[in-house]
Amino acid sequence: MTATLERRESASLWGRFCDWITSTENRLYIGWFGVLMIPTLLTATSVFIIAFVAAPPVDIDGIREPVSGSLLYGNNIISGAIIPTSAAIGLHFYPIWEAASVDEWLYNGGPYELIVLHFLLGVACYMGREWELSFRLGMRPWIAVAYSAPVAAAAAVFLIYPIGQGSFSDGMPLGISGTFNFMIVFQAEHNILMHPFHMLGVAGVFGGSLFSAMHGSLVTSSLIRETTENESANAGYKFGQEEETYNIVAAHGYFGRLIFQYASFNNSRSLHFFLAAWPVVGIWFTALGISTMAFNLNGFNFNQSVVDSQGRVINTWADIINRANLGMEVMHERNAHNFPLDLASVDAPSING
């Protein structure tokens, strides 16, 4: 009898826990994805803050030349970063217990792997939590689909690219100047600016900014005034009101006359789908581009210069880009390589005559 009561009590305790986890009445929805998201993101955030402030220099290139990234070792907010895991570790899973000591783990950049792997798991769970909450509320699933774009971009630079290049040391450093360094080296080695998928990403980000500004300004300019001239127009809106808050016909008429009639949406649902889809698809393509360049399927290169009938080079923009790429390539990891890869891979000229 006692055992039966205990089992019922434990079952009801588990049931209450399940109800609490999946309740949409909580101030912040937790959900089953949140059960994994909360500890992983807390771990990533905590280790990032500690490492950004106090981590010792990391031997990123595996050549016994540690690079300082933390504030206590001479950096500021701009130059500071979590230095990627050493090339000596490569793609090996490198938790603390795999190192001989904590000092060795820090020297080889263990915190970078810890932060990145927990972060990626956390943001993937955040995406799942968005879907889960939408499902509980009877909403459509497109919020999570839109969030998949930045998740794909993060996975591309923190996981797919290191896998393709063979080492976590090639991942993006976790800092401002480290991000710019990653971009410059990426351009030098993969000519990303000449990759069509990156071009689509640029169109997505800049186009999305333009469309967002256009939409916000059009709506704000065509509000239906419910207040006097002495009050803010914003005070005329009541949360949850059934009436339209702006005149879409006026906005459509304005924009149709500013550009031409069919450049303006007359369907609010089509408009908002477009506003969501444009940047999301662009960022999807950029993430796909990074993931293919990870395996050295690079952007267009025009290594053969245009020459005239006399064999003289006619300089084009491609020649300028090639020269810039070589300059950036010889300057990065300058003590790890004697020559940039583009020069070192060329067959040596014959000396036999």
Curated annotation (Swiss-Prot):
Disulphide bridges, residue numbers: none
InterPro entries for the chain: D1/D2, Photo_II_D1/D2_sf, Photo_RC_L/M, Photo_RC_L/M_CS, PSII_D1
Annotated positions of the Phosphothreonine modification: 2
GO BP terms in the entry: photosynthetic electron transport in photosystem II; response to herbicide
Feature type site, description Stabilizes free radical intermediate: 190
Entry binding sites for Fe cation: 215, 272
Protein name: Photosystem II protein D1
Organism: Adiantum capillus-veneris
